[in-house]
Amino acid sequence: MSHLAVSQMAVTVPVSSDFSVRRSAFKSSNLNFRDKSWAPVFTLGMKAKNCGWRNHNVICMSVQQASVPKVTVSPLELENPSEPPLNLHKPKEPYTATIVSVERLVGPKAPGETCHIVINHDGNVPYWEGQSYGVIPPGENPKKPGSPHNVRLYSIASTRYGDNFDGKTASLCVRRAVYYDPVTGKEDPSKNGVCSNFLCDSKPGDKIKIAGPSGKIMLLPEDDPNATHIMIATGTGVAPYRGYLRRMFMESVPTFKFGGLAWLFLGVANVDSLLYDDEFTKYLKDYPDNFRYNRALSREEKNKNGGKMYVQDKIEEYSDEIFKLLDNGAHIYFCGLRGMMPGIQETLKRVAEKRGESWEEKLSQLKKNKQWHVEVY
């Protein structure tokens, strides 16, 4: 069902000395109806206005896009377990799923190809947000003749209900690993990533062997629906956060009503490399009080020292707010290339020292309180 929202309304209301409003005397004007997808919430402000024969108060009603329709999901039985599913399918006995779709996520100027891959598991490999699937590419392991390839882990980029909201699919965010010879500069297909190329080259209907799900470090804590979650990613490390944010802002789950703050920092090379940017930008518009989104574009932006803008530079820029939020119990997550962590740790240590704090002690406390979540590869 669509909703009509009043974007602006002004009504002239006669009032007595005790400000009681006579219902029969309302006169409306300046009605504008826009965007069908929002349900209106009115805020009232009263100010005196001389209308000639009698003093009136003008009640100005401003409308916020505060009730955004969400998607109905099923089966809600996926909310019942108190513990996350773990290793339901072992690498030696993987589940055979089916490729639903493969979509290129990045633009032509991105350095490399990243794909969004939807897999149909028919409800047989359930998972929670923040977990990973193991993928076993077809073929033989060249280092172990007669044996299958090793398992490659990929963070799941959807909620437990999947992109179709029916609990039967899971999505992966995969960057194609291509090797270029450092001397000739030419691609050497024999050294390309086996699993990432298999996934990005897959077609709808192709079969895929998956193991898992695995992982508990990046699970989204849901004991406090008003908690703050600071999410830091480079590249495909944004995958689990897409799942978090869809659960927070897109899906209608009766037992989970998010009212806290989600703050995403995403570092990529350039605008063409941004992943799921349209989704995140929409959340920013729809939920300005509950979502913040900062991007670091290393090949297009400069930091305060004139160097490349990395995600740690954005962290330093907002460090006062971040540290205050951490002091108040915020969770902070890091996901992406392993090489991102040294620069981030150095930045956090430098900021802590400027604040007269010991970063080692603070980090120890964050880990003790289970506020610190890291998954790098």
UniProtKB/Swiss-Prot annotation:
This is Ferredoxin--NADP reductase, root isozyme, chloroplastic. One of its GO terms (cellular component) is chloroplast. Its cofactor is FAD. One of its GO terms (molecular function) is ferredoxin-NADP+ reductase activity. Belongs to the ferredoxin--NADP reductase type 1 family. It holds the Pfam family NAD_binding_1. Gene3D superfamilies: Nucleotide-binding domain of ferredoxin-NADP reductase (FNR) module, Translation factors. Keywords: Chloroplast, Electron transport, FAD, Flavoprotein, NADP, Oxidoreductase, Photosynthesis, Plastid, Transit peptide, Transport. Its main location: plastid. FAD binds at residues 152-155, 173-175, 179, 194-196, 236. May play a key role in regulating the relative amounts of cyclic and non-cyclic electron flow to meet the demands of the plant for ATP and reducing power. Is involved in nitrate assimilation. PROSITE patterns: FAD_FR. Pathway: Energy metabolism; photosynthesis. It is found in: Plastid, Chloroplast. Residues 1-61 form a transit peptide. Residues 92-220 form the FAD-binding FR-type domain. NADP(+) binds at residues 155, 175, 236, 268-269, 298-299, 308, 336-337, 375.
